[in-house]
Design a protein with these regions (language model features):
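Conserved phosphate/anionic-ligand binding catalytic regions in large, soluble enzymes, centered on
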Residues: 9-26, 131-154
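Acidic, glycine-rich active-site loops and adjacent beta-strand->loop/helix elements
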Residues: 13-14, 43-44, 135-137, 164-173, ...
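Extreme N-terminal starter segment of soluble prokaryotic enzymes
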Residues: 2-8
C-alpha cells in the first residue's frame, strides 16, 4: 500500500488519455528520452514478430502549449497476438529492465485490464482473446515505458489521482471497421472500473484503450475527486494530432498532499466457498487474482454442508477493481 505524501494528478478531462501522451508528460517531467530508447530495444528483443522498434521525442506546441510528443515506430511480421503472448513478453521486458515491484505489477495489471475489456466486448474468454492494434510493439512500449519512467522519476511510491477522462464523439476506425467514440474497449474499461467519463463534442478518438487502461491503473481507484496538493512540477504530453478545438495534451502534476487533506481508501471484500477443488487450482486462482490487482487474498478452511471440508477464499480489492476480480473469481 502506497503511503508517501507525494501525489501525482492526471488531468485528462479535456483531451483524453493515450499511451503516447503519458510517455510525453513523463518525459516533460524530467524522464530521459534515452530511457525510452532502452525500452524500445528491450521490447524488440522480447516481442516475437516485432523489429526496428524506435522511439522519437519531439517538443511541439498544442494549442500554444509546449509539450513533448512521443512517436513509436516498428515493423510487424504479425497482424495480431494473443493477450497471453503479450503478457508473457511484458513480463520478460519488466525483468530485463529491472522494474520495481510496483512497476512490474502495474504492467501486468494494465494488460489484464486491456484483455478483460476486449474479451467482454468480443464475447471471448480472456485466454482466447486476440489483440490486433493493441497487440503491437507500440502498445508494449507505452505500457512498459510508463512504468520505467515512473520508476526513474521516483513516482512508483506516489499516490496517483485522476479526474474525469475526456472522450470524443463521432467514429473511429480500426481493424478495417468503424466504431463509435469512445471505442467499445475504452467504454468497457471505464465502466468496469467505475471511472468518471466526460463526453465532448469533438469528433475524434481522444482516449485510446491503452490510455484508459494506464489511467485507471495508475489512479488505482482514486478517480473523480482530486485532493488538495501543493504543486511542484508539471509535465505536458502531446497527442499525435493538433486539434483546432482544444489543446491535445495530457497534464501530469507532481506535488505534496496538503496536511489538512486526508485521503481514505475504500475497499471491497469478495468471498466465496470452494468445495472439492484441488490445491493446484486454488494456488493458480490466488496468483491470477493478485496479478489482476487484488490487495490481498486469503484461504480459510471451513466446514460445509454435512461437515464436508472446504475452503473460503477471501479477496480484498479496491472498489474500481472489484467487478473484474469477481468475474475472475467465478471462472
Amino acid at each position: 500500500m502506497r503511503t508517501s505524501g507525494r501525489a501525482v494528478i492526471i488531468d485528462a478531462s479535456s483531451s483524453g488519455a493515450s499511451g503516447d501522451k503519458f510517455l510525453g508528460a513523463l518525459i516533460d517531467l524530467g524522464g530521459s528520452p534515452k530511457s525510452l530508447d532502452k525500452v524500445a530495444r528491450v521490447v524488440e528483443d522480447n516481442l516475437p514478430g516485432a523489429s526496428h522498434v524506435h522511439v522519437k521525442a519531439t517538443r511541439v506546441e498544442r494549442g500554444e502549449i509546449s509539450a513533448q510528443l512521443i512517436e513509436v515506430r516498428s515493423e510487424e511480421k504479425v497482424s495480431k497476438r494473443k493477450a497471453s503472448d503479450l503478457q508473457s513478453s511484458a513480463v520478460k521486458c519488466a525483468k530485463e529492465l529491472d522494474l520495481s515491484e510496483w512497476g512490474t505489477a502495474f504492467v501486468k495489471s494494465v494488460l489484464d485490464t486491456l484483455s478483460s475489456a476486449e474479451s467482454r466486448v468480443h464475447g471471448h474468454s480472456v485466454k482466447e482473446v486476440e489483440l490486433h492494434e493493441l497487440g503491437s510493439a507500440d502498445t508494449l512500449v507505452d505500457i512498459v515505458g510508463t512504468a520505467y519512467l515512473a520508476d526513474e522519476l521516483e513516482l512508483s511510491g506516489a499516490r496517483w489521482w485522476c479526474g474525469p477522462v475526456g472522450v470524443g464523439t463521432g467514429v473511429t476506425e480500426f481493424s478495417g471497421r468503424t466504431y463509435p467514440n469512445p471505442a467499445p474497449a475504452v467504454a468497457e474499461i471505464l465502466r468496469s472500473h467505475k471511472f468518471p467519463m466526460k463526453t465532448s463534442n469533438i469528433q475524434f478518438e481522444l482516449t485510446t484503450p491503452t490510455g484508459a487502461a494506464i489511467a485507471v491503473n495508475l489512479a488505482d481507484g482514486k478517480a473523480g475527486e482530486i485532493p488538495i496538493i501543493t504543486p511542484h512540477k508539471i509535465g505536458y504530453g502531446a497527442g499525435a494530432k493538433n486539434l483546432d478545438e482544444i489543446a491535445n495534451i495530457l497534464r501530469l502534476t507532481i506535488g505534496e498532499l496538503s496536511g489538512t487533506d486526508h485521503a481514505h481508501d475504500e475497499v471491497v471484500v469478495l468471498e466465496t466457498n470452494l468445495d472439492d477443488v484441488s490445491g493446484e487450482v486454488i494456488g493458480r486462482a490466488v496468483e491470477r487474482l493478485m496479478e489482476a490487482g487484488a490487495r490481498d487474498v486469503s484461504i480459510t478452511p471451513v466446514f460445509m454442508k454435512k461437515n464436508r471440508p472446504g475452503q473460503l477464499i477471501s479477496v480484498i480489492s479496491d472498489k474500481t477493481k472489484s467487478e473484474h476480480l469477481a468475474e475472475l473469481l467465478m471462472e
